[in-house]
């Protein structure tokens, strides 16, 4: 049954919420961050040709395009579609006799291996166990398939006998084993092993003996190709500012020969049957994939242009026009055939891993090719418009126009929407420029975007773009930096004039691995430049103060917070739990530290499988005619809300977020608006929920009011919470919105009982953090770090007693 598209868009989902997004596809237990597993290892789909597989007779190349498989005739340059249906097909591999293709079929939450008989068109599912199946390749005798399959320790290699159906385990080693390439001797297999380092390995099928041909770190788009004679490997490898395609000798792999280099990776290289050419797919500056080839001995890459596409069916187009208030409006779109197969635009498309939807963006009008027949369309703008859907019929050889009028449930005048933590490029199949964000920002109704430059282990990504193409007029687009000490915690820096160095340190890195350096040095760096330092994606559990949960908090965070050296906390992020992070934030507020609530989606815009920037965002109240400097001032003053969807306009004692009021009996109001359901609204005083009111059963608005007894010190805020995912426009695990606090008496005031309990709670987390630090730094002189923990402990103990 098709599982794509509109079910997730038209109504709330029935599935219970997870604490945060964890995985769309079956989990691989050893893999801690499925966003990378799904982003790097699962197929990329697009309108243009990907996954080239030259035929054994040298006359054609099988490719994936528009979610189906096609055969490109190399003489006529005509592509003929050979698969159909609602699922998305990718990664074709030829049988040695050229009569069959094996491929990956993606059903939006599961994969399987299918074999297609090209003479009859018959398909046979040959591998469909629970868990991921990827990367089929026929054995040299054509009687079996090698493929990758999930197991308890990761993803291993399997060999399937196509006659008997028997499956043999080739390798179940800890880690990932992908992209098997049978050696022509029939006795070995080349494959990509990911076990800490990423390695291209050659394995004996008889003995299991292996040797590594190449080793690197986070080879995100690397998939090896083996020459027909088994002597040469073609390999895409990352550079600091792009990718290269190299050749290496199987027997002496250390020297390499560069064939080509560029910004975007040369994806899925494959040798022609005669070994004379290497085919690959590559995205251009327009984010359109093209089929390329280069002589195996070197030379200029050439495009293998497809002159005609034979769909095997009548074809037309659908033109979608989106408006708000009668005027053309940018939008996020999802288009599909009547049976649920996604329709791909000519440019970049993405896969929403929360809802299982392929989407793109439109400036207000977009035309997409489609088979004649029924189509379904959904559109939203940002988080403020409920999904509008329509069905239409595409005429053969003609166009059908679909008009969708979007209606925001709230008016954001006087507020600016921002995402302060996402990445332009981060190892995905595209090489994006800053201007490539413009369509996304418009469709997501974002006014401020600060993509962060960051490292991919020992490579610095986008550092060459630092300071480039900044926009001062709204929407503002300005790079920030993510300083990524995996051990101490990641810190995002925005509003800075220069980059902090080093970008990385601490256990796990080859250089600066036992450095006596604090995250607080990066915070001080940002403060000196008038910027903001934020601990990003800080808490992945619902209650970080539960027994044993303290290890979920970044090692240095509590120490920095206790010493007042923490500017901001990323309260909403796709990869962490918003409610759990709020609990940590509450304790810091209760110490009297006016920690700014921040929001960042942490998506990677050059991935195919990623949610959109602004999926988690903040709204900052700036009034009319504000500048970017005004925005930053308001952000620092706490005049904001963070959200995954709902909107809250809060007044407590007449003051908005960031304001100051007196204690005692105080009236409050909240305007709640949401493009989807949200279960409840809660009033929070010094971290305790003191009043709960019903939210919204469906998209709309509600005015709420009440009165609350306030102590003489501390803070009060309002939040909105939902218990399950709601579908578009949301791409988050559950609805959550939180207004920044209104302070009682003065900014930074405290309630003695709440302050005392906060210190006690934070001391338990500090115990866990310090224990982790001492275990990692055993025998290492680190006086600055030890002094930081000591001073933080004294500060907390002085309050807790």
Language model segments and positions:
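Bacterial N-terminal signal peptides
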Residues: 5-14
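Sec/Tat signal peptide C-region and signal peptidase I cleavage site
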Residues: 15-19
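Sequence signature of WD/YWTD-type beta-propeller architectures
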Residues: 20-315
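Flexible loop/turn segments at secondary-structure boundaries
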Residues: 242-243, 265-266, 286-289, 425-427, ...
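A short, Gly/Thr-enriched small/hydrophobic beta-strand-prone motif that recurs across taxa
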Residues: 311-325
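C-terminal functional module detector
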Residues: 324-343, 348-351, 356-359, 364-368, ...
């Amino acid at each position: 049954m098709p599982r794509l598209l509109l079910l997730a868009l038209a109504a709330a989902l029935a599935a219970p919420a997870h604490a945060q997004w964890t995985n769309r596809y079956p989990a691989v237990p050893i893999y801690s961050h499925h966003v990378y597993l799904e982003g790097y290892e699962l197929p990329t789909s697009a309108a243009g040709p990907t996954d080239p597989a030259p035929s054994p007779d040298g006359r054609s190349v099988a490719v994936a395009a528009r979610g189906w498989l096609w055969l490109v005739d190399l003489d006529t340059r005509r592509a003929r579609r050979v698969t159909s249906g609602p699922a998305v097909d990718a990664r074709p591999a030829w049988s040695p006799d050229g009569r069959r293709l094996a491929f990956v079929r993606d059903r939006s939450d599961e994969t399987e291996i299918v074999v297609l008989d090209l003479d009859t068109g018959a398909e046979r599912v040959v591998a469909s166990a629970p868990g991921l199946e990827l990367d089929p390749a026929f054995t040299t005798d054509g009687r079996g398939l090698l493929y990758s399959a999930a197991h308890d320790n990761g993803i291993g290699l399997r060999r399937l006998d196509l006659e008997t159906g028997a499956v043999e385990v080739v390798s179940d080693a800890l880690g990932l084993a992908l992209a098997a390439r049978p050696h022509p001797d029939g006795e070995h297999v080349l494959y990509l092993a990911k076990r800490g380092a990423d390695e291209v390995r050659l394995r004996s099928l008889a003995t299991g003996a292996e040797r590594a041909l190449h080793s690197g770190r986070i080879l995100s788009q690397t998939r090896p190709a083996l020459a027909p004679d088994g002597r040469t490997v073609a390999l895409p490898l990352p550079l600091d500012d792009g990718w290269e395609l190299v050749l290496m000798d199987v027997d002496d792999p250390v020297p390499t020969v560069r064939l080509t280099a560029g910004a975007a990776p040369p994806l899925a290289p494959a040798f022609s049957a005669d070994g004379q050419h290497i085919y690959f797919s590559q995205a251009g500056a327009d984010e359109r994939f093209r089929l390329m080839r280069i002589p195996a001995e070197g030379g200029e890459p050439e495009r293998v242009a497809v002159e005609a596409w034979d769909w095997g069916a009548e074809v037309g187009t659908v033109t979608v026009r989106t408006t708000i208030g009668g005027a053309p409006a940018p939008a996020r779109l999802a288009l599909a055939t009547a049976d649920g197969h996604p329709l791909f635009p000519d440019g970049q498309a993405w896969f929403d891993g929360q809802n299982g939807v392929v989407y793109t963006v439109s400036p207000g009008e977009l035309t997409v090719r489609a088979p004649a027949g029924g189509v379904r369309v959904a559109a939203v703008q940002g988080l403020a418009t409920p999904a509008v859907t329509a069905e239409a019929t595409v005429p053969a050889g003609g166009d059908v126009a679909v008009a969708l009028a979007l209606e925001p449930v709230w008016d954001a005048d006087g507020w600016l929407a921002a995402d302060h933590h996402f990445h332009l490029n981060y190892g995905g199949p595209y090489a994006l420029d800053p201007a490539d964000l413009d369509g996304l920002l418009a469709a997501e109704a974002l006014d401020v975007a600060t993509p962060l430059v960051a490292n991919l282990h020992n490579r610095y990504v986008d550092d060459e773009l630092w300071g480039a193409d900044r926009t001062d007029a709204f929407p503002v687009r300005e790079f920030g930096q993510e300083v990524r000490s995996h051990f101490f915690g990641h810190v995002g820096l925005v509003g800075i004039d220069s980059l902090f160095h080093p970008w990385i340190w601490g256990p796990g890195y080859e250089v600066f691995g036992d450095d006596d350096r604090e995250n607080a040095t990066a915070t001080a760096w940002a403060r000196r430049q008038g910027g903001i330092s934020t601990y990003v994606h800080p808490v992945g559990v619902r209650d970080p103060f539960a027994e044993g949960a303290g290890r979920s908090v970044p090692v240095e965070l509590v120490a920095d917070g206790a010493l007042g050296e923490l500017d901001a906390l990323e309260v909403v992020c796709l990869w962490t739990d918003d409610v759990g992070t709020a609990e940590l934030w509450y304790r810091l507020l209760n110490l009297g530290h006016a920690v700014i609530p921040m929001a960042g989606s942490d998506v990677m815009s050059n991935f195919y499988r990623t949610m959109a920037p602004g999926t988690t965002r903040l709204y900052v109240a700036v009034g009319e005619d504000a500048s970017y400097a005004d925005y930053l001032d308001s952000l620092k003053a706490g005049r904001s809300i963070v959200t995954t969807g709902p909107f809250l306009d809060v007044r407590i004692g007449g003051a908005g977020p960031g304001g100051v009021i007196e204690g005692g009996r105080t009236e409050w109001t909240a305007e709640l608006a949401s493009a989807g359901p949200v279960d409840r609204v809660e009033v929070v005083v010094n971290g305790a929920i003191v009043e709960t009111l019903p939210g919204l059963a469906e998209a709309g608005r509600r005015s709420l009011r009440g009165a609350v007894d306030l102590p003489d010190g501390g803070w009060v805020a309002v939040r909105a919470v939902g218990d399950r995912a709601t579908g578009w426009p949301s791409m988050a695990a559950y609805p959550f919105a939180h207004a920044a606090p209104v302070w009682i008496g003065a900014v930074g005031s405290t309630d003695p009982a709440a302050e005392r309990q906060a210190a006690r709670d934070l001391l338990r987390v500090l115990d866990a953090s310090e224990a982790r630090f001492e275990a990692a730094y055993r025998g290492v002189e680190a006086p600055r770090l030890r002094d930081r923990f000591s001073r933080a402990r004294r500060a907390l103990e002085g309050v807790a007693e």
